[in-house]
């Protein structure tokens, strides 16, 4: 019986595909390793007064800084309202209909807002009256 279980587990392990990681994760990990290597060699060079900093490490550090700057700019652009093309597309969609027309999406959004506000008001009222029946 144990041989059968062992063989099944062995077969499952041998036939399983390794989990692949997204490419972005591997690139970030490689950049962090490159940064650590660069800083270590720079520290070692500073202590020994020897310039053995590798050009590959310098390029890796520059790549890391470039990606960090690109990510920071993307976050900043999204915080300010998205990319210019996205803002223009949103403006066109917003003003495509007549101003007096009521959009179904707006109605659903307002209904959702009212539902959440009513639920929150009921919860606050229940807590003000002594809590929910389960808490008494």
From Swiss-Prot:
One of its GO terms (cellular component) is extracellular region. It is found in: Secreted. Keywords: Amphibian defense peptide, Cleavage on pair of basic residues, Secreted, Signal. Residues 27-136 form a propeptide. GO terms for biological process: antimicrobial peptide biosynthetic process; innate immune response. Disulfide bonds: none annotated. Residues 1-26 form the signal peptide. Expressed by the skin glands. Its main location: secreted. The keyword Secreted applies. Residues 82-101 are annotated as: Disordered. The keyword Secreted applies. Belongs to the gastrin/cholecystokinin family. The pharmacological activities of caerulein are quite similar to the physiological activities of gastrin and related peptides. This is Preprocaerulein type I'.
């Amino acid at each position: 019986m144990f041989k059968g279980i062992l063989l099944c587990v062995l077969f499952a392990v041998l036939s399983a595909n390794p989990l692949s990681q997204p490419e972005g994760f591997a690139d970030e990990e490689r950049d962090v390793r490159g940064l650590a290597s660069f800083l270590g060699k720079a520290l070692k060079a500073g202590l020994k007064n020897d310039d053995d900093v590798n050009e590959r490490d310098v390029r890796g550090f520059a790549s890391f800084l470039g990606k960090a700057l690109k990510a920071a700019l993307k976050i900043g652009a999204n915080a300010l309202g998205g990319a210019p093309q996205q803002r223009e597309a949103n403006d066109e969609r917003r003003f495509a209909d007549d101003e007096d027309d009521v959009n179904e999406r707006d109605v659903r959004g307002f209904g959702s807002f009212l539902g959440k506000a009513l639920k929150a008001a009921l919860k606050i009222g229940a807590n003000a009256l002594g809590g929910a029946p389960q808490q008494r």
